[in-house]
């Protein structure tokens, strides 16, 4: 497993995600030290080691086209700025702020989490989404994200002409629009004249299947690289190398994996609680309050599940 770090050529100890390794720069790898697997260790310790060894292996196989890794890399302002400069073919673009996994809500309370939300010096807002699954990049989702951005980046009392110019950009593993093009720009037009409507809302699809020798094609090559040494653009390679080879970067990715795992467990428990609440509602013996307390839900959530009584 290649996990280089900032070490001298002599043998040194380092911890990755709580596990002790030794490294020698001559070999540029880590070797775990300590007791052999299974010897004098509790089941909890064995599970901990197994889980983190799995994380280390997964980190080495991560690519920019992978959603969780992409958000970590491009929450860096310099990287997101470079990405947008290439996609929009604008060397003059300067990003003022960038946020990853940015939550937005509509007026009904339904939320969406944007992979990357960036704002440039001219107050133009950019939502960048990575999608390996075709369903996640449906055209109406692009419309939905565009509307959410309008609703969330304006203040009450703002004039319509103060609306930010917005870009929703999907970088997709497959050619969603199926025309064999590297990039698609979607704009509203006036059908009778063919002229642009000019409302300031832009949607762009980038097809990562096209890996030619253009700036965009080389960028898409980088999106499918697992090894930073094989990447074309140093600004991206340096950031990828940090998360794959630097002790702090690897630890950050381990924590990110653990957070995803814990969230999945919470979602699983919540689904079980909802199904149990539905069964109790069908039984008709308990009140909303009793069911809510028993399943760890709110009374409002239980009422919303009661399709039988509300029908």
Regions found by a protein language model. Give the residues of each.
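Compact structured core domains
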Residues: 203, 207-220
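Short, charged alpha-helical interaction segments and adjacent helix-coil junctions
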Residues: 5-10, 15-60, 64, 68, ...
